[in-house]
């Protein structure tokens, strides 16, 4: 921009020297506001050049006056003009050099440095208010289903109820570090929020105090990652924008757990991920729909994922193999669980403001990977047989985002999940069988990092007995990201 302004000055000065009226002389170059000490130094040098321009203007005025009074010849006036033009050329060269030097200056670091380590603190403050109508029952106080969409907590078999709640529990904080070591970056990341901890009894009575809950914590070096992170079986970056904690939870893979993951770039936008992740088996008995946590797993879950990205799209396909295991009291069983997932994000339209996002997954014995355990991995009941009966699952969601303007946008989404229980053993009456939802929202970002949104969602839950429940929710959110 500085060079363009100076070229304009040069042209005007040369024209003025050859007889243009004084009214056409350009104004002094405006100084850009410095944003750093380096920019301040460059600005000072630019001001000195502007002073030289002012001297040149004075010389030109004297040349015109001399020509008008007959005290100098036309040759003298032309000589003065040439001298002024030469000065302008020299100034242009000097300013161009300054611009090049500024362009080559390193970008300001994101975060701050302590010793040889870069530190970054970030997150967001999110405030949510909602009005919910449950068509077939009511939730107990402190239930997470009051605060975000959790299909397994939609009541069934009761009278309709209405619930109003406001909170800031989805507020999130993280800090990360990066240290150069042997030509690679050694990184650490710790993240927590307040969303998934059970609300203390009486929390809303006065102070609304909530316990922080650990989300992610890992170290990475080069292509190796060790720690608690989103499962390799999904890509959380593909989830659609929503006022809700997740959005289409009923169709989502949703797991964070300990893992050892290795990423191998293959070129042309392809990456291969291989991971061994923390195992956990969730079961029901033939008479109770309460989830049983079994901690007798003997092998990690193994995941492989192939991911592709370019300027307008991101796609992945992943496979999961695991050992479903229950042992104790001299009894127990193992079974092979497996599944696959596909997902993606495709941007289109002016400035890529619109996008289509989707994910689908299916498998046997992988129920805990869907919707925070909407359905179990298996049914296990020692009173019937010392055997695991695996449950089949299919789930998916899709969304369409429309960017109406640079600051106004909407997302429309749908989610679905179905669990198929084995026929050879009884299924509890309240075991979750199916869930689906539809939602639409409108988001407005009046300034950078500040979002306001409103969303409507209709959802249905069905259980093995044939009972069903509905949920209708209008939710508003304000979010400041830092």
Task: Enumerate the language-model features and the residues they cover.
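Detector for outer-membrane/organellar transmembrane beta-barrel domains
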Residues: 310-432
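Outer-membrane beta-barrel "beta-signal"
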Residues: 444, 470-482
